[in-house]
Curated annotation (Swiss-Prot):
It is an enzyme of class 3 (hydrolase). InterPro entries: Amidohydro-rel, HutI, Metal-dep_hydrolase_composite, Metal_Hydrolase. It comes from Ralstonia nicotianae (strain ATCC BAA-1114 / GMI1000) (Ralstonia solanacearum). This is Imidazolonepropionase. N-formimidoyl-L-glutamate binds at residues 146, 321, 323. Its cofactor is Zn(2+); Fe(3+). Catalyzes the hydrolytic cleavage of the carbon-nitrogen bond in imidazolone-5-propanoate to yield N-formimidoyl-L-glutamate. It is the third step in the universal histidine degradation pathway. GO terms for cellular component: cytoplasm.
Amino acid sequence: MADIRWDALWTHVHLATLAADADGYGEIRDGAIAVRDGRIAWLGARADLPAGARAEREHDGGGAWLTPGLIDCHTHLVHAGNRSNEFEARLNGVPYEHIARAGGGILSTVRATRAASEDALAQASLPRLNALRAEGVTTVEIKSGYGLDLETERRMLRVARRFGQTLRVRVRTTFLGAHAVPPEFAGRADDYIGHLCADVLPALAAEGLVDAVDAFCETIGFSPAQTARMFDAAQALGLPVKLHAEQLSDQGGAALVARYGGLSADHLECLTDAGVAAMAEAGTVAVLLPGAFYCLRETRLPPLQALRQAGVPMAVSTDCNPGTSPLSSLLLAMNMACTLFRLTPLEALTGATRHAAAALGLAGTCGVLAPGCVADFALWRIDRPADLAYAMGLNPCAGVVKDGAPAR
């Protein structure tokens, strides 16, 4: 038999492949995984390693569990400013409406972000990203949406791109100009959407800063008609879409984004049966955001059983943002998804890997351990995969591999 040459080989590891055709976690006890050119070349039981196989670098996992690298598929982690004062005020009985009228809320983050330089934005945001990376996250989505003007949206997306180019993490950028109406367009939401579609999005897309387009479709955000205009502009530029949908009320957003073949609909506490059916038909991923549910002390759960029965993939993410989910731990988000939403640990881990990849248009690229996929994985000092969604306040991550090379 001809020699088989690999760049790297990990042995003495237990694999949780999370492959779609696997039973449960896709466990392979006492396994091995080989990498060539940044991709998985082989995996299986260590006893089944091909005869004559050789690797330039061999790593002994010491009995660790090895999973796909985690994927945080919905974050707003690039921003300036701090809103802990609002958190304190709300807990002291001040209504959010009073806070907003006094200049707080999302527009306070917009002011702080507009005032920050690109370097200052990067410096403020890096600790949030590094907290995720320390927990085995190898892919992260980062949205704009705290600039609401061309120059600040550009700065936010440039920071996100910089992180992807300079750190061992894959970054997918999402343009969220339709997040709120900025002060200069107060009372003129239609005009603002027109400005985004005609001026801002085309300019940012031309600079290669946008991987997808999102909007906040809600009574306090943008109407379905305004959202559809945003999606039309995105599709004209060849960009996929996703949506903040049905968080506070049923606006038909899930069915709308499904009609556009959207990657995901996110939040979904007020999702209807019609929305579930539309998502199932389109293959749109349901992104669950238990951090926002927790911080807002919501009581209405997304229709988890209906999503399960319809076969809608469910992803789990942090929704890291300064106002409603200041959460930089995907492991804690997984625990919240189990505790608050009653996901199983398997559903939570699959939601932070394979289904999160699909929510970013990366299905078949990452999120599973399979030959041909990028070699992004994490090693864990745990007894079984369910521990990742079980324990709180501990970080059992023993190592991270990005594109086949150790990343920490």
